[in-house]
Swiss-Prot record:
Biological role stated in the UniProt entry: F-actin cross-linking protein which is thought to anchor actin to a variety of intracellular structures. This is a bundling protein.
Gene name linked to the record: Actn3
Annotated keywords: Acetylation, Actin-binding, Calcium, Metal-binding, Repeat
PANTHER family: SPECTRIN/FILAMIN RELATED CYTOSKELETAL PROTEIN
Protein's recorded name: Alpha-actinin-3
Composition bias type Gly residues, residue spans: 10-24
N-acetylmethionine: modified positions: 1
Length: 900
């Protein structure tokens, strides 16, 4: 049977194996009648090539053909071939073995071919069933055209021209290769080797090929293609070389296999690149997360170690030890804390940058591990600063306490030494029985002397009480040598009590003897009575002139100077009293000379001589100018301290308002930035540089503060700004400008990633600022909802809650400007999705629902292949080999849609 069926759209001169219009396969080169009379060499080539091509597909179904004109006669393998290459199911074949069953099966195959837009010309089922070789080869060629060549498209060309253009482009760089057709251009085998080398340079050493060895070149290409590219050998090298013009259809069929093999590889490469891109983003984000965790852990560990040190309030017994503690604290403030402040600021910047990158890549927001949130670090930092302030206050309080203790201890030692010097020998004197052998006058003298002693003793009562009071105060202030103080004080008190007892006993004895004795020297008594208090006054003056003091201001020093001047004003009257006392002694001597008395040496009523009074008076006169000089030196020191206070206050009163103004200015800049982001960044960088340049003023102020600390000046009434206030304000200013610069940098990232114009950013900023009612760079949920409604969003409670989870993933209760921009641009962004990554993995897996480690290592770079293998869960579906991996769950986890 001879059917002459022309495909739709064929005009005059078009052949049976070419299509017209949209289904054009190839141009007709010869008339159909000539095509029926194939050259025997061409027929041999076609028969071998078409058989190999059919078997390359039939083997997927577990079968093959041996004789092309015989094995397709019953139509069964023909239908199976079409199902394999099309991926579609054909009607159920007839199982009978009679001729009409075979014709029916072949017709089902031909109808399926026709349903694909191909009109068969002169090919009928009867010819195929009868084993007509020419018709069978023509039918197979039609199938090859439709299913292997028609879909080839390069630029504006398709089918044969597209395949030829593809070959020309791929082989263009190679020497001795000039592909112009599908027959003679392939005879020397170099074109096939060039195609293989272009895509798999590891398989062929093209430089070693020779144009004069066509059979060797062809066999090399055939063997490599069959072994490594899964392309069966469809041609014989000898047939191609020995034929003047090899069969075009055979060559096209074989070359099309290379196109499909390499096109699939290119598609896999594209899929691998997409996966690599996604994995690179994910790995970079994980690296940032790990860096954040490491930096946060180190900062928190430093705070954990530092806080106990600052909380330690165990005082030191000596001033030098406390001074060392103060120096350690200054070193901490100057050397150890500033780098940690920078780390804290950098930690916040890294966290914001990471969250921005995660939002831009549609990854879930980063949630640090427990206890390492930015808020946790801020809380820990606030706790550190609180104990730090308390530690500094405690240090200064302890130093003042030790100063007070040192002053009291020195005063106690001085007064105790004076008292002990006064009491030295008094007990031995009171225990004497000299009155037993004395005359009346001597007894009276002893009695009067004793009265003078009692007067002196009474005068010392206040000193003893003062010594006891000093000891009590030292105990109350926890003086570290309180035990020795108590022991000495107790010895003084015991001795004083004993002196009182002995004094009373001696008086009783003298009064008993007084009844027997009548002579008394009134003048000596008068001398004793006046000299004793004057001597007391001298002792008190000497003690006061040698007294130590502790002052903290010019006013206190002036008060001491005034008291000293008042004391000097009493000296003339004291000098007159001294003259009167010395006059009494002179009168005694005159009377003795007048009446020829020979008294015992010294005054019987007092051990004090006029020489003693003169010596003490000379001591007082020497101590007065010395105390004048000491007080003037102290006044000069306090005046220097006052200048230091005023110098510090002048700088602090300028720096404090400057810092406050800059903080407010940065706040205004953050709330109302104008101009392009680059201009804003330049302005902020200039502000940052101005702030950095101002650091020298802070350093000078620190120097003045250091001088005040070294001079032990701890108060300053000339300014409300302490060094701590300046430090806190300076750290707040640095943090504020760094945070604002980071926000603009994130806006640049968002703009570049989302493709926003400056006008759009300005519009977003204007809307955001309008509803930022608190002017703190953040909108509260009600303000954010009002902003969305004003922009035309119709929001219900559920929808608004969903939007809030997007813009506020950490549930902070506010919407930042960065989150606002991200929401407004989210719908227009072109980003990767989990579905795209799944599709890419499916290409690498050859349309399987799982992928093997070998396929990952073959298609991906080694590092990222191993990353996928470690992270992918085992595939749990049926029919998978051991070690198969679930790429679907892995892709979803990359975008937060499931757990890794």
């Amino acid at each position: 049977m001879m059917m002459v069926m022309q495909p739709e759209g064929l005009g005059a001169g078009e052949g049976p194996f070419s299509g017209g219009g949209g289904g054009e396969y190839m141009e007709q080169e010869e008339d159909w009648d000539r095509d029926l009379l194939l050259d025997p060499a061409w027929e041999k080539q076609q028969r071998k090539t078409f058989t190999a091509w059919c078997n390359s597909h039939l083997r997927k179904a577990g079968t093959q053909i041996e004789n092309i004109e015989e094995d397709f006669r019953n139509g069964l393998k023909l239908m199976l071939l079409l199902e394999v290459i099309s991926g579609e199911r054909l009607p159920r074949p007839d199982k009978g073995k009679m001729r009409f069953h075979k014709i029916a099966n072949v017709n089902k195959a031909l109808d399926f071919i026709a349903s694909k837009g191909v009109k068969l010309v002169s090919i009928g089922a009867e010819e195929i069933v009868d084993g007509n070789l020419k018709m069978t080869l023509g039918m197979i060629w039609t199938i090859i055209l439709r299913f292997a060549i028609q879909d080839i498209s390069v630029e504006e060309t398709s089918a044969k021209e597209g395949l030829l253009l593809w070959c020309q482009r791929k082989t263009a760089p190679y020497r001795n290769v000039n592909v112009q057709n599908f027959h003679t251009s392939w005879k020397d085998g170099l074109a096939l080797c060039a195609l293989i080398h272009r895509h798999r340079p590891d398989l062929i050493d093209y430089a070693k090929l020779r144009k004069d060895d066509p059979i060797g070149n062809l066999n090399t290409a055939f063997e490599v293609a069959e072994k490594y590219l899964d392309i069966p050998k469809m041609l014989d090298a000898e047939d191609i070389v020995n034929t003047p013009k090899p069969d075009e259809k055979a060559i096209m069929t074989y070359v099309s296999c290379f196109y499909h093999a390499f096109a699939g590889a290119e598609q896999a490469e594209t899929a691998a690149n997409r996966i690599c891109k996604v994995l690179a983003v994910n790995q970079e984000n994980e690296k940032l997360m790990e860096e954040y965790e490491k930096l946060a852990s180190e900062l928190l560990e430093w705070i954990r170690r530092t806080v106990p040190w600052l909380e330690n309030r165990v005082g030191e017994p000596s001033m030098s030890a406390m001074q060392r503690k103060l120096e350690d604290f200054r070193d901490y403030r100057r050397l150890h804390k500033p780098p940690r402040v920078q780390e804290k600021c950098q930690l916040e910047i890294n966290f914001n940058t990471l969250q921005t990158k995660l939002r831009l890549s549609h990854r879930p927001a980063f949630m640090p591990s427990e206890g390492k949130l930015v808020s946790d670090i801020a809380n820990a930092w606030r706790g550190l600063e609180q104990v730090e302030k308390g530690y500094e206050d405690w240090l200064l309080s302890e130093i003042r306490r030790l100063q007070r203790l040192q002053h009291l201890a020195e005063k106690f030692q001085q007064k105790a030494s004076l008292h002990e010097a006064w009491t030295r020998g008094k007990e031995e004197m009171l225990n004497q029985h000299d009155y037993e052998s004395a005359s009346l006058q001597e007894v009276r003298a002893l009695l009067r002397r004793h009265e003078a002693f009692e007067s002196d003793l009474a005068a010392h009562q206040d000193r003893v009480e003062h010594i006891a009071a000093l000891a009590q105060e030292l105990n109350e202030l926890d003086y570290h040598e309180a035990a020795s103080v108590n022991s000495r004080c107790q010895a003084i008190c015991d001795q004083w009590d004993n002196l009182g007892t002995l004094t009373q006993k001696r008086r009783d004895a003298l009064e008993r003897m007084e009844k027997l004795l009548e002579t008394i020297d009134q003048l000596q008594l008068e001398f004793a009575r006046r000299a004793a208090p004057f001597n007391n006054w001298l002792d008190g003056a000497i003690e006061d002139l040698q007294d130590v003091w502790l002052v903290h201001s010019v006013e206190e020093t002036q008060s001491l100077l005034t008291a000293h001047e008042q004391f000097k004003a009493t000296l003339p009257e004291a000098d007159r009293e001294r003259g009167a006392i010395l006059g009494i002694q002179g009168e005694i001597q005159k009377i003795c000379q007048t009446y020829g008395l020979r008294p015992k040496s010294g005054n019987p009523y007092i051990t004090l001589s006029s020489q003693d009074i003169n010596n003490k008076w000379d001591t007082v006169r020497k101590l007065v100018p010395s105390r004048d000089q000491t007080l003037q030196e102290e006044l000069a020191r306090q005046q220097v301290n006052e200048r230091l206070r005023r110098q510090f206050a002048a700088q602090a009163n300028a720096i404090g308002p400057w810092i406050q103004g800059k903080v407010e200015e940065v706040g205004r800049l953050a709330a109302g930035l104008a101009g392009s982001l680059e201009e804003q960044m330049a302005g902020l960088r200039q502000q940052e540089q101005n702030i950095i340049n101002y650091k020298s003023n802070i350093d000078r102020l620190e120097g003045d503060h250091q001088l005040l600390q070294e001079s032990l000046v701890f108060d300053n009434k000339h300014t409300v700004y302490s060094m701590e206030h300046i430090r806190v304000g300076w750290e707040q200013l640095l943090t504020s400008i760094a945070r604002t610069i980071n926000e603009v940098e994130n806006q640049v990232l968002t703009r570049d990633a989302k493709g926003l114009s400056q006008e759009q950013l300005n519009e977003f900023r204007a809307s955001f600022n309008h509803f930022d009612r608190k002017r703190n760079g953040m909108m509260e949920p009600d303000d954010f909802r009002a902003c969305l409604i004003s922009m035309g969003y119709d929001l219900g409670e559920v929808e608004f809650a969903r939007i809030m989870t997007m813009v506020d993933p950490n549930a902070a209760g506010v919407v930042t400007f960065q989150a606002f921009i991200d929401f407004m641009t989210r719908e227009t962004a072109e980003t990767d999705t989990a579905e795209q990554v799944v599709a890419s993995f499916k290409i690498l897996a050859g349309d399987k629902n799982y992928i093997t480690p070998e396929e990952l290592r073959r298609e991906l770079p080694a590092e990222q292949a191993e990353y996928c293998i470690r992270r992918m869960a085992p595939y749990k579906g049926s029919g998978a080999p051991s070690g198969a991996l679930d790429y679907v769950a892995f892709s979803s986890a990359l975008y937060g849609e499931s757990d890794l």
